[in-house]
Amino acid sequence: NVSIRTKSIISQIKPTEKGGFNLSVGGQMTHCQSLVVASGGLSIPTLGASGFGYDIAKQFGLGLLPRSAGLVPFTFSDWVKDICETNSGLSIDVEMSVNGVSFKENLLFTHRGISGPAALQLSSYWKSGQVISINLMPDQDARALLLRYKESNPKSLLRNLIAPLLSKGFTQSLQSRYWPQHAETPIAEIANETLENLASQLSNWKLKPSGTEGYRTAEVTLCGVNTDNISSKTMECKSQPGLYFIGEVLDVTGHLGGYNFQWAWASGYTAGCYV
């Protein structure tokens, strides 16, 4: 028989001398031989996420690694936010990098910052205060492209040449920031050194996020219960027989694409084979 209890709060968990656990559930005592903690992380609290699983880990003396939001949009509070807000809804293909890790995927501008697969993936490797790099032309050699435009389209304005690659609105935003003095200057009259500096901005756009959207919109919680304390064969706690941890509550985080769901299902199945 399987009893499913909804809207129930576990207020106390006590291991017994004969094995198993006594649980206080909604004011009633329940005994179980095996206890599987599948509480998830802190992400999206409006769906009921909480630190309950971490509290259980602390109770039984298990190591916890510092948690933070992962697979989450970046936010900005300076002029970058103005650019993002102006171009909110625009998506472009980029390559984003931080700490030696790069993702070549889609970037989406929002009214508060940047999102999309590239930004979400990178957020799991970013630390507060770090600068990120964005290659706005990942399939082009920006320097060679601008110098080639100078030869082939000498009378054209720089923004009109770049717009087909980055969109008219975003190119206008970049122009206002990086080459306002050459807004109406034919590219043939712009010095090669200036074009090379602009190419560096396009291929290595350095931005410093003010933060992220946090757990409110994060798809996962980074870190959690130290896996050194958990058997990779059974998901059972090494120091407390009968206690299992599975899914996101553990220090396991996957990339976008269903990997975190797969981890939850696989670790749950594994524990289910041994309880």
Task: Give the residues covered by each predicted segment.
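Glycine-rich phosphate/pyrophosphate-binding beta-alpha loops
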Residues: 44-45, 73-74, 110, 114-117, ...
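An anion/pyrophosphate-binding glycine-rich loop and adjacent beta-alpha core
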Residues: 62-66, 72-193
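N-terminal Rossmann-like dinucleotide/flavin-binding domain of flavoprotein oxidoreductases
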Residues: 1-3
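Glycine-rich nucleotide phosphate-binding loop and flanking beta-alpha elements
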Residues: 12, 42-45, 116, 126, ...
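A conserved FAD-binding loop/helix module that cradles the flavin
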Residues: 41-60, 252-275
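A glycine-rich dinucleotide-binding beta-alpha-beta segment and adjacent secondary-structure elements
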Residues: 6, 176-253
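A conserved short coil-to-beta-strand element within the FAD-binding core of flavoproteins
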Residues: 6-20
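Short hydrophobic core segments
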Residues: 10, 29-49, 57-58, 107-112, ...
